[in-house]
């Protein structure tokens, strides 16, 4: 038996779309502002088939010309309840959110403010600098404090 492993192509979408729709592990949201898409956020589910779900805030980005206007905060605050609602629809519950970032990245303030995330680990020289792992154990309640 020979199994060929290759990179995914757009032609493969039909073969995997059913699985992706039945169990979406990634959720991508965009921020529209002043007539265009100015940012996005990508949430990735890390829990396999467990009912207690850990999400990773995989990426949040805002176009440079539109930063410092609250778009990043809006992306987190407005998309996370929607993700939690989707989880609840399949009888799953959001347990925590994890996010990693450079130890000197100002985005840590955003993660503390919007998620209640705190640094739980620091990894020396992971990429080009030190990286921190932040965990939010009550992410939906962070803004209610």
Question: Predicted segment positions?
Answer:
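Active-site beta-strand termini and strand-to-loop segments that position acidic
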Residues: 32-34, 136-139
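Conserved acetyl-CoA-binding loop of GNAT-fold acetyltransferases
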Residues: 111-122
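Conserved N-terminal entry element of GNAT/NAT acetyltransferase domains
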Residues: 1-11, 138-145
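Conserved beta-strand-loop-alpha-helix junction that forms the acyl-donor binding cleft
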Residues: 67, 90-108, 124-130, 137
């Amino acid at each position: 038996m020979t199994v060929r492993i290759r990179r995914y192509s757009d032609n493969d979408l039909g073969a995997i779309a059913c699985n992706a729709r039945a169990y979406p592990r990634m959720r991508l949201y965009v921020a529209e502002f002043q007539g265009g898409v100015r940012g996005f956020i990508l949430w990735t589910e890390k829990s396999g088939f467990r009912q207690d779900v850990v999400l990773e805030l995989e990426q949040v980005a805002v176009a440079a010309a539109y930063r410092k206007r609250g778009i990043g905060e809006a992306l987190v605050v407005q998309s996370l309840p929607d993700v939690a609602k989707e989880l609840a629809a399949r009888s799953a519950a959001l347990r925590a959110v994890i996010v990693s970032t450079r130890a000197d990245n100002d985005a840590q303030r955003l993660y503390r403010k919007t998620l209640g995330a705190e640094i739980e680990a620091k990894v020396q020289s992971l990429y080009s600098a030190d990286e921190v792992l932040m965990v939010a154990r009550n992410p939906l309640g962070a803004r209610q404090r």
